[in-house]
Amino acid sequence: MRQGSIPGAHGRVRPLGLLGDPVLHARCAEVTDFGPELAALVEDLFATMYAAHGVGLAANQVGEAVRVFVYDCPDDEDERHLGHVVNPRLVETGGVVVRGPEGCLSLPGLEAGTERYDEAVVTGFTVAGEPVTVRGTGFFARCLQHECDHLEGRVYADRLTGRRHRKLMRQVARASWHR
């Protein structure tokens, strides 16, 4: 039997920022107030992520330039990882670099082969201010690195070069959501 509420059950679905929105391309500020507004933001992030069928979502993707992300993401063994991190730090990456398909709720409908390590460790805090360490492998490691990138003002397209980058940018230009 499940203990506690389902993440996002009390949150509201917020509009998603899209590639080109300034908040997506600037480093986010550290969270200093671990109060009810932060808890409400985490609930909103979960609600928005689930509504968009995502596996992770950073606060700046809903217009909040603070260092918070949520996730509900499987690893390569299909083990589910569910949680959030406030003021995350990507403290370790390792294993091998794998080029795999990567998408983003801020570039809807698009994906590109993006290189990421297959192991990652993130430290940070919960909404209650308790320290947390999250370890990921495979797809979940990719998710952790992707969300940490968002909070630094980067999207996966920024990691692409050459032909892959040009191809993705052509797809962005043709996308119905592109301004």
Swiss-Prot record:
Pfam families, sorted: Pep_deformylase
Cofactor: Fe(2+)
Single GO MF descriptor: metal ion binding
Entry keywords, A to Z: Hydrolase, Iron, Metal-binding, Protein biosynthesis
GO process annotations (BP): co-translational protein modification; translation
Reactions performed catalytically: N-terminal N-formyl-L-methionyl-[peptide] + H2O = N-terminal L-methionyl-[peptide] + formate
InterPro entries per UniProt: Peptide_deformylase, Peptide_deformylase_sf
Source organism superkingdom: Bacteria
Positions annotated as active site in the UniProt record: 147
Binding-site positions, Fe cation: 104, 146, 150
Record EC number: 3.5.1.88
Co-factor note (free text): Binds 1 Fe(2+) ion.
Protein family membership: Belongs to the polypeptide deformylase family.
Described function: Removes the formyl group from the N-terminal Met of newly synthesized proteins. Requires at least a dipeptide for an efficient rate of reaction. N-terminal L-methionine is a prerequisite for activity but the enzyme has broad specificity at other positions.
UniProt name for this protein: Peptide deformylase 2
Gene name of the record: def2
